Swiss-Prot record:
Its cofactor is heme b. The keyword Transmembrane helix applies. InterPro entries: Cyt_b/b6_C, Cyt_b/b6_C_sf, Cyt_b/b6_N, Cytb/b6-like_sf, Cytochrome_b, Cytochrome_b_C_euk/bac, Cytochrome_b_N_euk/bac, Di-haem_cyt_TM. It is a multi-pass membrane protein. GO terms for cellular component: mitochondrial inner membrane; respiratory chain complex III. PROSITE patterns: CYTB_CTER (PS51003), CYTB_NTER (PS51002). A ubiquinone binds at H201. This is Cytochrome b. One of its GO terms (biological process) is mitochondrial electron transport, ubiquinol to cytochrome c. It comes from Cephalorhynchus commersonii.
Length: 379
């Protein structure tokens, strides 16, 4: 009798993707983050759904509806903080996943990589519009400042901003449409993630050595299902610890003050996961230049496969490239710190130097050092 798992049209797809999938035998825990991102997405959609049942996307009631969720809804505070801190966990996994791709040369699967960059942009958009919904001070001013960046676009900028706002300032129309975007985008992310997976399974996974592993594959289940479950337990434990012991650790106290267009907060800043890009934006004293640098800081990922000059795919056996990679990580952490600081000396100059180093490392140093490594290996 044929196994239904391998013959039924629906289970066959699942079987080929998660059970009998041939997987390299040597992939490390850095390969866990893909499944953890899937778990984060499911958790965010579920908690978000329950929050949407009680939230009202109207300027006069949005803030109080969030307070109502936290005070009056059964376990509403728990759902709300799971959702808020779940976003932080999502970005931690996302950045680790991208870092893994950069280190081990996974970007050489170009379709998978490009869909991944598109996914990153979509997740960032979702997080941004979601941050506006509680309608606190930082929600309102964050929305005002970031949407205003589009006014730097020559000729059509101002019209574009007013079109997005649905008026002459961030108001009711803006909040309503941002709620609509925040509701629909996760489903678009889910569809893109399926395409991401589809392209990945066309080529099979990369592995830490960067050498083709066709001759040494093992089935995904049970070897990697059990490994993914362990990763999931760590993720859930961290999320629960954060949610139950320090729910506001990563948030901004200003967002507990209702939005007031007449009072600007002393320091307008986004959530921690956008601070590196915000620091790059602020480091350029020209508005259009800042916006372009902000865009390029993310879109530079698309050009990574074109900047590959090494004859080896992975950085596993390339100590000089490893040094530059960890310098890049340190630089990003510096930018994240700078993004949360006020615009004054010495933070301005540190931010500018860190921004220059970020682009210089990716566009110049890493490709050059890769060529030197080729020479040293007589390739």
């Amino acid at each position: 009798m044929t196994n239904i798992r391998k013959t039924h049209p629906l289970t066959k797809i699942l079987n080929n993707a998660f059970i009998d999938l041939p997987t390299p035998s040597n992939i490390s825990s850095w390969w866990n983050f893909g499944s953890l991102l899937g778990l984060c997405l499911i958790m965010q959609i579920l908690t978000g759904l329950f929050l949407a049942m009680h939230y009202t996307p109207d300027t006069s009631t949005a803030f109080s509806s969030v307070a109502h969720i936290c005070r009056d809804v059964n376990y509403g505070w728990f759902i709300r903080y799971l959702h808020a801190n779940g976003a932080s966990m999502f970005f931690i996994c996302l950045y680790a996943h991208i870092g893994r791709g950069l280190y081990y040369g996974s970007y050489m699967f170009q379709e998978t990589w490009n869909i991944g960059v598109l996914l990153l942009l979509t997740v960032m958009a979702t997080a941004f519009v979601g941050y506006v919904l509680p309608w606190g001070q930082m929600s309102f001013w964050g929305a005002t400042v970031i949407t205003n960046l589009l006014s730097a676009i020559p000729y059509i900028g101002t019209t574009l901003v007013e079109w997005i706002w649905g008026g002459f300032s961030v108001d009711k129309a803006t909040l309503t449409r941002f709620f609509a975007f925040h509701f629909i985008l996760p489903f678009i992310i889910t569809a893109l993630a399926a395409v991401h997976l589809l392209f990945l399974h066309e080529t099979g996974s990369n592995n830490p050595t960067g050498i083709p592993s066709n001759m040494d594959m093992i089935p995904f289940h049970p070897y990697y299902t059990i490994k993914d479950i362990l990763g999931a337990l760590f993720l859930i434990l961290t999320l629960l610890a954060l949610t139950l012991f320090a729910p506001d650790l990563l948030g901004d106290p200003d967002n507990y003050t209702p939005a007031n267009p007449l009072s600007t907060p002393a320091h307008i800043k986004p959530e921690w996961y956008f601070l590196f890009a915000y620091a790059i934006l602020r480091s350029i004293p020209n508005k259009l230049g800042g916006v372009l640098a902000l865009l390029l800081s993310i879109l530079i990922l698309i050009f990574i496969p074109m900047l590959q000059t090494s004859k080896q795919r992975s950085m596993m056996f390339r100590p000089f490239s490893q040094l530059l990679f960890w310098t890049l990580i340190a630089d990003l952490l510096t930018l994240t710190w700078i993004g949360g600081q006020p615009v004054e000396h010495p933070y301005i100059i540190v931010g500018q130097l860190a921004s220059i180093l970020y682009f210089f490392l990716i566009l110049v140093l890493m490709p050059t050092v890769s060529l030197i490594e080729n020479k040293l290996l007589k390739w």
